[in-house]
Amino acid sequence: MSQTGSHPGRGLAGRWLWGAQPCLLLPIVPLSWLVWLLLLLLASLLPSARLASPLPREEEIVFPEKLNGSVLPGSGAPARLLCRLQAFGETLLLELEQDSGVQVEGLTVQYLGQAPELLGGAEPGTYLTGTINGDPESVASLHWDGGALLGVLQYRGAELHLQPLEGGTPNSAGGPGAHILRRKSPASGQGPMCNVKAPLGSPSPRPRRAKRFASLSRFVETLVVADDKMAAFHGAGLKRYLLTVMAAAAKAFKHPSIRNPVSLVVTRLVILGSGEEGPQVGPSAAQTLRSFCAWQRGLNTPEDSDPDHFDTAILFTRQDLCGVSTCDTLGMADVGTVCDPARSCAIVEDDGLQSAFTAAHELGHVFNMLHDNSKPCISLNGPLSTSRHVMAPVMAHVDPEEPWSPCSARFITDFLDNGYGHCLLDKPEAPLHLPVTFPGKDYDADRQCQLTFGPDSRHCPQLPPPCAALWCSGHLNGHAMCQTKHSPWADGTPCGPAQACMGGRCLHMDQLQDFNIPQAGGWGPWGPWGDCSRTCGGGVQFSSRDCTRPVPRNGGKYCEGRRTRFRSCNTEDCPTGSALTFREEQCAAYNHRTDLFKSFPGPMDWVPRYTGVAPQDQCKLTCQAQALGYYYVLEPRVVDGTPCSPDSSSVCVQGRCIHAGCDRIIGSKKKFDKCMVCGGDGSGCSKQSGSFRKFRYGYNNVVTIPAGATHILVRQQGNPGHRSIYLALKLPDGSYALNGEYTLMPSPTDVVLPGAVSLRYSGATAASETLSGHGPLAQPLTLQVLVAGNPQDTRLRYSFFVPRPTPSTPRPTPQDWLHRRAQILEILRRRPWAGRK
């Protein structure tokens, strides 16, 4: 693995390689000698899992009777099938029609260059749906290949599983042969299955801005490309093979451990023939990726609603790809680029059916996932985490119970919550439903060995245990060897009488049926509120819920809706005396860091940077080094509860600016008035405004802005090509906060003032020189202009609001004076000395 690039503004990004473990090579020797060696070699590779007990079932052997003409896939024959079978003492009449929604042969294969003749055939099999005995509440969903039926029947509250009986007697009437029909009974105490479905015929949702902290369905419309080496190797089976690989990759993205409803949808399949000027595919993985990314963009359409549009592209090749130092590379992709048309792409070296995990791994990078051994992932996964996840840096047997690590789930969740997956919200109009059968049914162990090690390779049957690791024959230095790449047998591969592999285990067919039935997930209860992010000044606390009641299984729908909620906390004012704002404290935490700039001799002071920061980046910790004048993103996120800007009451929550009122309550509608009084009516202050035109060379006092002033605005307009006056600010102690000592600040900047107040300055070279801020000022400020020439047609205007004087005791009215005078005269008249002369 190596990182060779970066993508600013999206956390860690770059180009990543996925490597392969070195093959184990063993000479073909008698089994008795080899057993102990294999036990040692495979001990670390075998999955530790307990076999599930089969659920109670009833079953019968049946012979489906076809009542209408043959249905020949791809031949234009009637897409309707009537079938009758006797089971459980009842006659079941199946009225089936071809389901266009799952019609594999509906996919258009696009050939660029000379199309290979062997690839023009249609795929075997038709998907049929219908009813049973005319019951509108019943459901029949079956796959028909001209000689066998495979699928599920739901009739009168019972669930029936129909499949061909291996080694069964053919039907004497020429119809389907012997099948086995199982009636599955729910386990005792098991409640009804939650199965949420979208209404049939419902319109596709339009792309919209993602809700924050919500689980939303994402549809990854994928272009699959195979080069000429793939066509030469796979021949007529290339299309079926690619769909099988992508089906396994899509299944990985459906696993609940990814904690998001992600559907991988193949919308276009392109096969490159000879004579086509396609991407330059060579040994260098990096150069191949760059060439493919540039080439695929020309095939895309810009409109997301266009049926030919795709969100990501993936190239399969038989070319041996090499990284910087070795040729163990199996794939490469950029990180965090899923909605970037120029970089949402990946390349995969075809290595057999396990290439599905390579494809899932590279697409994981496109979703911003890092390798599980990266520094951020080590802390998120914990010390007990294994290396058997999709995003492991080296290909290994992926844990079927948890294919995605906690780190992968966290990174894709944060990525989508921050709006980077906006292009995935539109549902494809005509999606291709990938093969539903397990790949091992179409590719036995020998064929899997051929796909991995070449056409002469065969499965080594003498090497136990079955399913855990695929051992294949080969030659090294003229000697016959058995070799493995540590990948398990493909799911569905026969491993014994009435047994097949699943997740690296050999299971009975009864147990295998449990993996065919999707189960939709359901939300669990909300968890308790977490700690507040701040002790004062307005923090944020969270509560979350998980998709665990029940956990989705076998590709069942993941929960949709809000997974995290948050609220304000500790909104009271912080104690007076703190000279720094909350964001200033976060920047100042880097003041003693000497490892950021090796060329700078010592530590430096960091202050927040607001000017020039894009609105979408307000919640990154962007700080400016006062000594150098440069500014950098020191943290991808500020602490939750940090104000988005000095002029806003909105706060940052998980890297996004969320509206809050001036009372520091998220969602509140309270606002500051012009006097900066929360919820006030503006009556507590008055506007002061004026202009200045008496310019003389040097610094000129314009006005003293008093302490407590709010909504300050100063604007100087004139011909910027002949400007000769500039704004300046002087503090009470005689020092300058802006443009003092005949030194100008040419670019936009934040003027930091005592009392954690800042004003935004446009820069001396701006077309309209301005100075603005909400205040209130903690101390008086003298506005000056620096005259450096003969000002012509220059206008300087200013305005601000000042608090109204506190009203004193009201003056008595004339009536009050008359009444009080009468009282005094009456008191004097009653005095003993009154009236004496």
UniProtKB/Swiss-Prot annotation:
Keywords attached to this entry: Cleavage on pair of basic residues, Disulfide bond, Extracellular matrix, Glycoprotein, Hydrolase, Metal-binding, Metalloprotease, Protease, Secreted, Signal, Zinc, Zymogen
Domain (TSP type-1): residue spans on this chain: 520-575
CDD domains reported for this sequence: ZnMc_ADAMTS_like (cd04273)
Cofactor: Zn(2+)
Spacer as annotated region, ranges: 686-837
Record's cofactor remark: Binds 1 zinc ion per subunit.
SUPFAM superfamilies assigned: Metalloproteases ('zincins'), catalytic domain (SSF55486), TSP-1 type 1 repeat (SSF82895)
Species annotation: Homo sapiens
Annotated disulfide bonds: 293-345, 322-327, 339-423, 377-407, 449-472, 460-482, 467-501, 495-506, 532-569, 536-574, 547-559
Entry binding sites for Zn(2+): 194, 361, 365, 371
Posttranslational mods: The precursor is cleaved by a furin endopeptidase. Glycosylated. Can be O-fucosylated by POFUT2 on a serine or a threonine residue found within the consensus sequence C1-X(2)-(S/T)-C2-G of the TSP type-1 repeat domains where C1 and C2 are the first and second cysteine residue of the repeat, respectively. Fucosylated repeats can then be further glycosylated by the addition of a beta-1,3-glucose residue by the glucosyltransferase, B3GALTL. Fucosylation mediates the efficient secretion of ADAMTS family members.
Domain Peptidase M12B: 218-428
Active site, UniProt feature: 362
Pfam annotation, one family: ADAMTS_spacer1
Main function: Cleaves aggrecan, a cartilage proteoglycan, at the '392-Glu-|-Ala-393' site and may be involved in its turnover. Also cleaves COMP. May play an important role in the destruction of aggrecan in arthritic diseases. Could be a critical factor in the exacerbation of neurodegeneration in Alzheimer disease.
Subcellular location: Secreted, Extracellular space, Extracellular matrix
Free-text domain note: The spacer domain and the TSP type-1 domains are important for a tight interaction with the extracellular matrix. The spacer domain is also required for cleavage of COMP.
Catalytic activity: Glutamyl endopeptidase. Bonds cleaved include 370-Thr-Glu-Gly-Glu-|-Ala-Arg-Gly-Ser-377 in the interglobular domain of mammalian aggrecan
Subunit details: Interacts with SRPX2.
Main localization of the protein described in the UniProt heading: secreted
Protein known as: A disintegrin and metalloproteinase with thrombospondin motifs 4
